[in-house]
């Protein structure tokens, strides 16, 4: 897709791996060879957009002692070709940025990366213990959360944040985007914005449950007993399709905190979170039983 961060992520992840293997610092790589700042090298390795040309990529590979020719070089130039092809296609279409980047004035810096991953993923699994995930939030629910975080938001800024959430929800209608949402029961009982806001939010969830084959919503009841969901904080697992070059990008775990977000890519960490997901799914209600529980809670709030 135009604006997808996936090829840039593949490029940056591999360049970082080669740099670490060659025991080169970002400063050396930038200062001695391609005249980029260390910050730019870091952004590139994080999969962010950086102005760089093919000759600079070659210079980096020479610095990292990557033989020419070699499979290691191919693993750089395959995603690099996709980055360039994507940029050209976007330029011809007049869409050189991802749609979400029109809202950069309305979210934290780390969230640009999050929405890019969300747009590129084909499977998202999220476990939430306090608040509903953005993909489920109604305008009223999102408004209450935004004002809780920043009570001084102008009406115009608040409206743009609501537009962003609405735009993100469109992906739920994509049959190629599988979404598994696991919610602690307490999430359905928090009342940001008051009882009427929660009532509308619960009604929205009831409309979604079972209505789209690519979206699963399941609740962990309070009486579920012991399970790993009691020990892990809220997190989201992103999984991605193969690139056009058939290279496969590993999954990413996102953990959000009050001061920012944490992106985890180590295979051991991914495996631990997969085990947590399996254990949470073991004790979560079926979608049928989830709907019955949501209906019960909704009646308490006037739905």
What is each residue range found by the language model?
Residues 13, 17-20, 27, 39, ...:
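A broad, structural surface signal
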Residues 23-43:
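Short alpha-helical DNA-recognition segment
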Residues 30-31, 49, 53, 227-230:
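Short glycine-biased active-site loop of nucleotidyltransferases that positions the nucleotide triphosphate
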């Amino acid at each position: 897709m135009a604006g997808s961060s996936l090829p840039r992520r593949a490029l940056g992840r591999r360049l970082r791996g080669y740099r670490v293997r060659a025991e080169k610092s970002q400063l050396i790589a930038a200062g001695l060879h391609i005249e980029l700042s260390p910050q730019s090298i870091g952004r590139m390795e994080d999969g962010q957009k950086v102005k760089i040309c093919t000759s600079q990529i070659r210079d980096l590979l020479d610095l990292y002692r990557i033989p020419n020719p070699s499979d290691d070089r191919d693993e750089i130039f395959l995603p690099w070709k996709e980055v360039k092809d994507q940029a050209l296609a976007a330029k011809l279409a007049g869409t050189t940025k991802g749609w979400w980047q029109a809202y950069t004035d309305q979210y934290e810096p780390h969230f640009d990366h999050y929405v890019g991953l969300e747009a590129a993923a084909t499977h998202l699994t999220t476990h939430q213990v306090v608040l509903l995930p953005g993909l489920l939030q109604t305008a009223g629910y999102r408004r209450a959360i935004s004002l809780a975080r920043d009570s001084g938001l102008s009406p115009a800024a608040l409206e743009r944040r609501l537009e962003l959430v609405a735009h993100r929800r469109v992906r739920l209608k994509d049959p190629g985007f599988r979404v598994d949402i696991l919610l602690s029961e307490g999430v359905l009982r928090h009342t940001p914005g008051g009882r009427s806001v929660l009532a509308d939010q619960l009604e929205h969830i009831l409309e979604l449950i079972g209505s789209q084959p690519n979206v699963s919503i399941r609740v962990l009841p309070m009486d579920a007993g012991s399970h790993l969901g009691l020990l892990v904080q809220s997190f989201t697992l992103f999984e991605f399709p193969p690139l056009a070059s058939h290279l496969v990008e590993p999954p990413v775990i996102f953990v959000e905190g009050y001061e920012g977000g944490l992106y985890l890519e180590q295979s051991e960490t991914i495996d631990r979170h997969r085990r947590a997901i399996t254990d949470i799914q073991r004790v979560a209600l079926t979608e049928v039983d989830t709907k019955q529980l949501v209906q019960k809670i909704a009646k308490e709030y006037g739905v």
